[in-house]
Amino acid sequence: RQFKPVDQGAWLYMAELNPEEPWKLISDPVLLSMPEYGWANNHTFVDEGPFALITEKKIFLTFSSAAVDSTYVVGLLSADPEADLLDPKSWIKENYPLMSSRSKEGEYGTGHNSYIMDEDGLVWNAYHGKPGVDGPRSSGLRRVHFGADGYPVLDLTEEKDLAPGLTEVSMDVVVK
């Protein structure tokens, strides 16, 4: 196993695009992320498939790392909205994955996610995982919660998604 990452074409770079011709770069690409942690460089050196989640206080960029097997994970970069996003120093990389094979029992290799906002303003995480270590890739959808620090929480199980005391609702209706 190699321990020093080698760029094989699947690291995260950012550059400014020409607004009139968005297929043309008008700045040099800058490296935002490479697989520098053990959880990110299993079998291959990949940081790929970035997707932005923008809130009032932070810009989050999730990405997938490792091989597309049970080691596949979702990592996180964050930056302040007013920061120079082309400056790599503006981005903070978390040293742990937000989703992994340990996030939910029976779900392996969770990765390559995106976000959807529904008509009620709830944010949902769409991703793929495997029902078994060697199972086929399957789609998953889970509600995104935000911690007290404003960061997304992607690994809540169904049991933790809603407090048990809130699962049953009753009311009295008075008709006059």
Residue ranges and their predicted role:
Residues 1-176:
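Carbohydrate-active catalytic/glycan-binding domains of CAZyme proteins
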